[in-house]
Amino acid sequence: MTATANTFILGAGVEWGTTFVTLVTFVILIILLKKFAWGPLKEVMDKRERDINKDIDDAEQAKINAQKLEEENRKTLKETQDEVQKILDDAKIQARKQHEEIIHEANEKANGMIETAQSEINSQKERAISDINNQVSELSVLIASKVLRKEISEQDQKELVEKYLKEAGDK
């Protein structure tokens, strides 16, 4: 049975020596692969995994930083918009004040011009009345002198005119 046990169905026998050498060679090959190929390969794979994890962590940190930056930008934009609105409101208030001041100054200037014009009118009126009084007195003297056929002095004439003007003014 030993002779039959060493033969397989196809009639080939097992050679234990060759099998042992093949097995030892295979084990040596596995050890060499583990030492020279698997170790460096595993090291490369571990480094790659660390790099990927680091890249993921960096990406997450960058995302967090981007969110913070976006929030800061929104806050800055809001502050800027508020500041612009305040500047616009202040400008409107200042414009209203200037408008009121300009109107006030224009009214004061117009009132001053009106007062000046009224003073000028009153002054001219007084001059005109004085001129008319002088002319009336001259005419009165002329008429009176023709009527009386005599000349009266200038002082008497003025007193007479003033007397008649006062009497005319009282009526």
UniProtKB/Swiss-Prot annotation:
> What does the sequence similarity comment in the record state about its family?
Belongs to the ATPase B chain family.
Listed under GO cellular component are: plasma membrane; proton-transporting ATP synthase complex
Q: Which GO terms describe its molecular function?
A: proton-transporting ATP synthase activity, rotational mechanism; proton-transporting ATPase activity, rotational mechanism
Matching entries from Pfam families are given as: ATP-synt_B
The UniProt keyword set, sorted, is:
ATP synthesis, Cell membrane, CF(0), Hydrogen ion transport, Ion transport, Membrane, Transmembrane, Transmembrane helix, Transport
TM ranges are 13-33
The free-text function statement in the UniProt record for this protein reads:
F(1)F(0) ATP synthase produces ATP from ADP in the presence of a proton or sodium gradient. F-type ATPases consist of two structural domains, F(1) containing the extramembraneous catalytic core and F(0) containing the membrane proton channel, linked together by a central stalk and a peripheral stalk. During catalysis, ATP synthesis in the catalytic domain of F(1) is coupled via a rotary mechanism of the central stalk subunits to proton translocation. Component of the F(0) channel, it forms part of the peripheral stalk, linking F(1) to F(0).
Q: How does it sit in the membrane?
A: Single-pass membrane protein
Instruction: Indicate what this protein is called per its UniProt record.
Output: ATP synthase subunit b
Question: What main location does UniProt list?
Answer: membrane
Which InterPro entries does this chain map to? ATP_synth_B-like_membr_sf, ATP_synth_b/b'su_bac/chlpt, ATP_synth_F0_bsu_bac, ATP_synthase_B_chain
Q: Which organism is it from?
A: Staphylococcus epidermidis (strain ATCC 35984 / DSM 28319 / BCRC 17069 / CCUG 31568 / BM 3577 / RP62A)
Q: How does it assemble?
A: F-type ATPases have 2 components, F(1) - the catalytic core - and F(0) - the membrane proton channel. F(1) has five subunits: alpha(3), beta(3), gamma(1), delta(1), epsilon(1). F(0) has three main subunits: a(1), b(2) and c(10-14). The alpha and beta chains form an alternating ring which encloses part of the gamma chain. F(1) is attached to F(0) by a central stalk formed by the gamma and epsilon chains, while a peripheral stalk is formed by the delta and b chains.
User: Where can this protein be found?
Assistant: Cell membrane
